[in-house]
UniProtKB/Swiss-Prot annotation:
Top-rank taxon: Bacteria
UniProt organism field: Campylobacter jejuni subsp. jejuni serotype O:23/36 (strain 81-176)
Keyword Nucleotide-binding listed: yes
Name of the gene: purC
Stated name of the protein: Phosphoribosylaminoimidazole-succinocarboxamide synthase
Top EC group: ligase
Reaction equations catalysed: 5-amino-1-(5-phospho-D-ribosyl)imidazole-4-carboxylate + L-aspartate + ATP = (2S)-2-[5-amino-1-(5-phospho-beta-D-ribosyl)imidazole-4-carboxamido]succinate + ADP + phosphate + 2 H(+)
Lineage, uppermost ranks: Bacteria, Pseudomonadati, Campylobacterota, Epsilonproteobacteria, Campylobacterales
Length: 236
C-alpha cells in the first residue's frame, strides 16, 4: 500500500490518502493538547503508545461485536483504516463524575454515577465543542434520524460494558471516555478515531492515581510514564 498526500491533520493524528480510495493511513502524533488546544505540548513516543493501546482495545471490541474502522496496524505509529464520513458528534460516556460534569452540575468529584451517562458534544473547535442534546442533533442534521441517535447511544453503552470490566481486571478504573463514530461507504456505523489515554480517563483502582491526559492538563508530570503503565497493564 502506498502512502500518498495528507488529507487531514487533527490534534492527535494525521490522515493520509492511499492507492485504495476506500482506505486511509492514520498516523498518531506525539503532540499533546488540552482545553480545546489552548494548552499544547509534545511527548516523544506518545504517538506510538497511543497507537499500540488503541490497536489492542479496538481488537478487543471487535472480538465482542463492535464494528470499527481499523483494518491493520502497519508501524509503531500507523494504522490502515476504512475511509469514513465522521459523524460530527463527540460521544462521551461517564461512569464517575469528574472534569466538566462536576463544574456544570455541581456533582462532587469522584462520585460514582448510578448508571453510565452518555453525553454529546458538537465537533466544532471554533464554538468550543458545546454540549448538545438529541434534538440539537436532529435540528443541525448531525444524524440521519432518531434511530441513528439510538444506535449511537447503544454502541457507546455496549463499548462501556465491554471496557469497564476489562480495565477493572487490569486494576484500572474507566472513569469516562470520548469516542467518535463514522459511516462507511455502505452506511455502516463504526467506531473510528482512537481509544487511548488521550481520550479516556483512567484511575488506578486502589490509589486513584491518574494515568491519562489529565497528567498534562493538570501539570502532574510523568505523562509518558502513565501511558506506558496503561499499555503494560493492557498487555499483561
Amino acid at each position: 500500500m502506498t502512502k500518498k498526500e495528507m488529507l487531514y491533520e487533527g490534534k492527535g493524528k494525521k490522515l493520509f490518502k492511499t492507492d485504495d480510495e476506500n482506505l486511509l493511513i492514520s498516523e498518531f502524533k506525539d503532540d499533546l493538547t488540552a482545553f480545546n488546544a489552548e494548552k499544547r505540548g509534545n511527548e516523544s513516543g506518545k504517538g506510538a503508545l497511543n497507537c499500540k493501546i488503541s490497536t489492542e482495545i479496538f481488537h478487543l471490541l471487535e472480538k465482542n461485536g463492535i464494528k470499527t474502522h481499523l483494518v491493520e496496524t502497519i508501524s509503531d505509529t500507523e494504522q490502515v483504516v476504512k475511509k469514513c464520513k465522521i459523524v460530527p458528534i463527540e460521544v462521551i460516556v461517564r461512569n464517575v463524575a469528574t472534569g466538566s460534569l462536576t463544574k456544570r452540575l455541581g456533582i462532587k468529584d469522584g462520585t460514582v454515577l448510578p448508571f453510565a451517562l452518555v453525553e454529546f458534544c458538537l465537533k466544532d473547535d471554533a464554538l468550543g465543542d458545546p454540549f448538545i442534546n438529541d434534538e440539537h442533533c436532529l435540528i443541525l442534521n448531525l444524524v440521519q434520524n432518531e434511530a441513528q441517535i439510538s444506535e449511537i447511544k447503544n454502541m457507546a453503552r455496549k463499548i462501556n460494558s465491554i471496557l469497564t470490566p476489562f480495565f477493572d481486571n487490569k486494576n484500572l478504573r474507566l472513569i469516562d471516555f470520548k469516542i467518535e463514530l463514522g459511516l462507511t461507504k455502505d452506511n455502516e456505523l463504526v467506531l473510528a478515531d482512537e481509544i487511548s489515554p488521550d481520550s479516556c480517563r483512567f484511575w488506578d483502582k486502589f490509589s486513584n492515581e491518574k494515568l491519562d491526559k489529565d497528567r498534562f492538563r493538570q501539570d502532574l508530570g510523568n505523562v509518558k510514564m502513565a501511558y506506558e503503565e496503561v499499555l503494560k497493564r493492557i498487555l499483561n
